[in-house]
Amino acid sequence: MVRSLHIIGSRGSGGAERFFARLSTALADTGNPVLAITRPGARLRGKLGENVEHRMIPMRNVRDLVSVWQIRRAIADWRPDIVQTYMGRATRLTRLRDRSGPVHIARLGGYYPIRQYRRADAWVANTRGIVDYLIGAGFPAGRVFQIPNFVDTPTAGNAADRERLRLTLGIPPAAHVILGIGRLHASKGFADLLAAFARLPAVLGGRPVFFILVGAGPLERTLQRQAEALGLEARLRWPGWQAEPAPYYRFADLMVCPSRHEPYGNVILEAWSHRTAVLATATAGGRELIAPGENGWLVPCGDAERLATAMTTLLQNDVLRAQLAMGGEETLRTRFSRHAVVKAYLELYQKLLNERGEE
């Protein structure tokens, strides 16, 4: 049994936050004690399982010395074997006094500024590209590990749920539905997706084409103005940020991940878990996850014309979409299952603890 303390200092609900909640819950569900520390008001609080102990620390910024002391106090009180931090703020605020206590693992899901992570004893990256990035920056290769993300198996929807969502959104019964989901930020490429959607005909194969964009962020108003300028309002839906996006994945015929920069792509895994076909841009994450033609479709980043062509092709080919969705589900089962990822983390924890004991 391994006691692990997990710390995240953001309040959002992005990929890192969702994975923090999933992994903390999954580890606790295997009988390993878990303490999760978040900021007050963090959206992910309700995502933590009932077996996860939870505390809150302000973590106002990376120079919050009161929070440094509170984290040390929590570690001294709870006495974990492992302290795992997520993203820069939590990692910089976690300052272990010496090597006689728990092992500090920093978990990275992006190409973050290196200086924020040097205090840790070991590092976990969720892609090969991030592993290479860390080693190239001078981190010891023997202390950098790759463990992917996982997504939980969703509960099955039904026809009544789909019909309720359709009526809520005001989308015709026979419509093709394209889904975009994520933070409305420049790196996510939603401006390219809007430009591509504007190139599609309003009707394909006798079926109207609609686009749902789920998310919130700094570019929300900018993207809305772009959509208005392109004349897309009648076929575009903006449900905003959704704490539970599963109904939207199930409702869509095609999930498009148009990012210009994407280290991983949790939305790809989430779409696969709902048997939804995926079209993505060839970001580092897209290339690592997708085998083109087998479990998804890739197009160049920032190319609205190629994106539009691919959307048209996939919407017109039900068989191909079904094949890609099945391939995605199989990839998820074999490479990104909850069981495999939790097993990898527990094995890493034990390895690092054994090495610490030999020092």
Task: Identify the residue ranges that each predicted region occupies.
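N-terminal strand-loop element at the rim of the active site
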Residues: 6-14, 18-67, 74
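A conserved mid-protein helix/loop that constitutes part of the nucleotide-sugar donor-binding site
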Residues: 14-25, 176-201, 211, 218-225, ...
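Short hydrophobic beta-strand element within catalytic cores of glycosyltransferases
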Residues: 37-38, 277-280, 290
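Short His-centered aromatic/hydrophobic patch
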Residues: 63-67, 85-91, 108
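Carbohydrate-associated surface elements
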Residues: 129, 150
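A short, well-ordered alpha-helix in the C-terminal region of glycosyltransferases
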Residues: 167, 224, 313, 320-335, ...
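Aromatic "clamp/platform" in nucleotide-sugar-dependent glycosyltransferases that forms part
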Residues: 241, 260
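Conserved acidic donor-binding segment of nucleotide-sugar-dependent glycosyltransferases
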Residues: 291-293, 297-304, 313-319
